[in-house]
Amino acid sequence: AVVDKAKEYNVPIRVGVNSGSLEKHIVEKYGKVTAEGLVESALDKVKMIEDMGYDNLVVSIKSSDVLMCARAHELLAPQCTYPLHVGITEAGTLFRGNIKSAIGLGIILNQGIGDTIRVSLTGDPVNEIASAKQILKTLGLRKGGIEVVSCPTCGRTNIDLIGLANEVEKMVTEFDDLDIKVAVMGCVVNGPGEAKEADIGIAGGKGEGLLIKKGQVVR
């Protein structure tokens, strides 16, 4: 019935396979949940729908195991011509989930695999969007939006670098139309050099600061 309705309106069907709900016979075949089993399950479902005369499909394989998920996509991609929706499922809270998603999606996307993505986090879905955009931008797959780079604190830091960097990062979220890099540096010793690849940068010192543009101190 679902396939018939999808045919009627030409609506894509997402064929989803999750490591947490893999078919019992496939788990028994491989002895446990494996990348090979995830791929087999997905291809079985694809064939079933194709046999019903429908091929407007999107395929999604997800696992909370980062390396298993990456391996599954490496195995699936050569065997599948349909768009792939990529994500690390049940990745966790903001801290752990972002790390797992960045590593997993980075491995997969950097191989040219994947058409759409989702960062799955336990929390506000708005954070998922921001994280997904940053992952794509870091991999060179998305343009636009101001990138903020900042140095770690060290013994030369005499300003509230953490607070300043966070404040700048919040300010730039409104400017998706600008594709520039902003550097926030904590000292005037290494700041100018570290900010030279940024379009604009600031380097703060004790009672002083520098404004840097394209590697040149302008103020």
Where do the PLM segments sit?
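Short, charged, surface-exposed secondary-structure boundary motifs
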Residues: 1, 94-97, 211-214
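Hydrophobic or amphipathic alpha-helical targeting/insertion segments
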Residues: 1-12
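Conserved, mostly hydrophobic/aromatic
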Residues: 15, 59, 108, 151, ...
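Catalytic alpha/beta core domains of metabolic enzymes, predominantly
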Residues: 18-21, 26-173
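Conserved structured catalytic cores and adjacent interaction surfaces
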Residues: 125, 154-158, 188-194, 198, ...
